[in-house]
Regions:
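Structural motif
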Residues: 21-29
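Long, charged low-complexity segments
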Residues: 3-22, 34-109
């Protein structure tokens, strides 16, 4: 089953889900999530991966803020921020966005 073209995507999904389940989310999990969003957006024909962030009641301003945070966690050039532990609300943000994303797009194992 892991030899399918989507084996990589499922592997990344499992890594992120395990980090959420074990409450050990780190900055690099946001990078992995962005990678998953980018690949899914490309597959589904979206121009922007941020369009896949579909939390009910989320405003455009919230979406832009989430995208900025994911970008900063993914492309961080400041070493001080690399080592900085995530706050509980940042860990919860990944959980909210990831679980909404996997639910909305009907991801299966």
């Amino acid at each position: 089953q892991n030899d399918t073209p989507f084996g990589y995507h499922l592997f990344i999904k499992r890594i992120i889900q395990k980090a959420i389940d074990d409450n050990v989310v780190e900055r690099y999990h946001f990078m992995l999530f962005r990678n998953l969003l980018e690949k899914t957006a490309s597959f589904l024909g979206y121009n922007n991966w941020g369009d896949l962030l579909l939390v009910e009641g989320m405003s455009d301003e919230d979406r832009k803020g989430y995208i900025r945070f994911i970008n900063s966690a993914s492309h961080n050039k400041v070493s001080d921020l690399e080592a900085k532990e995530l706050k509980p609300n940042e860990k919860n943000l990944l959980k909210l966005l990831f679980e909404t994303f996997t639910g909305e797009y009907k991801w299966k194992e």
